[in-house]
Amino acid sequence: MNTFSVSRLALALAFGVTLTACSSTPPDQRPSDQTAPGTSSRPILSAKEAQNFDAQHYFASLTPGAAAWNPSPITLPAQPDFVVGPAGTQGVTHTTIQAAVDAAIIKRTNKRQYIAVMPGEYQGTVYVPAAPGGITLYGTGEKPIDVKIGLSLDGGMSPADWRHDVNPRGKYMPGKPAWYMYDSCQSKRSDSIGVLCSAVFWSQNNGLQLQNLTIENTLGDSVDAGNHPAVALRTDGDQVQINNVNILGRQNTFFVTNSGVQNRLETNRQPRTLVTNSYIEGDVDIVSGRGAVVFDNTEFRVVNSRTQQEAYVFAPATLSNIYYGFLAVNSRFNAFGDGVAQLGRSLDVDANTNGQVVIRDSAINEGFNTAKPWADAVISNRPFAGNTGSVDDNDEIQRNLNDTNYNRMWEYNNRGVGSKVVAEAKK
């Protein structure tokens, strides 16, 4: 017997089985082939560099010596403080979410207030003001879609039209807790209300918790492919937790800001937000703003039914002297269309901005542009430039991850067709 021939046959058969197994494994389940330093169009972190980008770093305090925020899972009481649902239903304390929020704020307590929302559709805005204690708002249905908060608002609408849609029957009045929020928008003298006032759900509450519900700006595809900011959820507070929530819209679906009560971006605050087990949908600059936000086990879905030729997931407006902006880990990036969508771009609201984002340990599908995964900055039109650094004598990559001459948009250990690093032509 020719053992050599048998061995070769066995190896060939084994190799063939291996190839078959690999080819049948979906791309998003295969190991990542991203290697540092990547390219100037798609910079990739090394394992050593990636150690700097986890929740602990993003949730550090700007106050020297202060402990980092270490959020625990949201826990719900056996009996909430307030229940929102149909009139006459046993246990219901309020028929609108805003009325329940107002009642919780009026208590002026530093004790967390729990608001349970029964299944149903709740049309209209919800404003959660700053308060001594945190608010937990949660749906009691089996799924997030069972509780739906929605309204159609366009940042391009006039203040008069906005007042008509947002404040029917004196929902916001002087003396009510959220009046100052409403007044900061309704008193605008500009032609349009703007992105910051286009939010359906707006919170300035430190410690806000949202769970098991859906928030949607229903403007959707009723407008053209032009500039139509339409925020579903806006949060300004610190230590915000969002779990098992659908956030739906098109442009600027989820907007995080460090605005104070004057409703303006600030330079000395870094609000921190944790988003887990959630679903976020939109087309242009889906997640925007200024703050430290960690997304864990969250799906980002890009729809191109309105814009067709462009789509961006992240648009961070991180200050240049702040090292941490947005972090997505163990998440999924899905886009319709053939390589049109991009992972993000810096939202250059001023000369002190250099948006920061890291996508790591996540799956990116074929709907994303692999040749140019990151876009040029919005507003300033600053061309995207990733820092590939240099390699020292010990084969270690040397680069400043916060060099203001480069963008700060990074990836690490991602997989899927859309995660491919395309070689760049030598200049």
From Swiss-Prot:
GO terms for molecular function: carboxylic ester hydrolase activity; pectinesterase activity. A lipid is attached at C22 (S-diacylglycerol cysteine). A lipid is attached at C22 (N-palmitoyl cysteine). The active site is at D285. Residues 1-21 form the signal peptide. Disulfide bonds join C185-C197. It comes from the Bacteria. Residues 23-42 are annotated as: Disordered. Gene3D superfamilies: Single-stranded right-handed beta-helix, Pectin lyase-like (2.160.20.10). One of its GO terms (biological process) is cell wall modification. Pfam families: Pectinesterase. It is found in: Cell outer membrane. It is a lipid-anchor. One of its GO terms (cellular component) is cell outer membrane. Substrate binds at R345. Keywords: Aspartyl esterase, Cell outer membrane, Disulfide bond, Hydrolase, Lipoprotein, Membrane, Palmitate, Signal. Its EC number is 3.1.2.-. Belongs to the pectinesterase family. Putative thioesterase. Does not bind pectin, and has no pectinesterase activity. NCBIfam families: PRK10531.1. This is Putative acyl-CoA thioester hydrolase YbhC. It comes from Escherichia coli (strain K12).
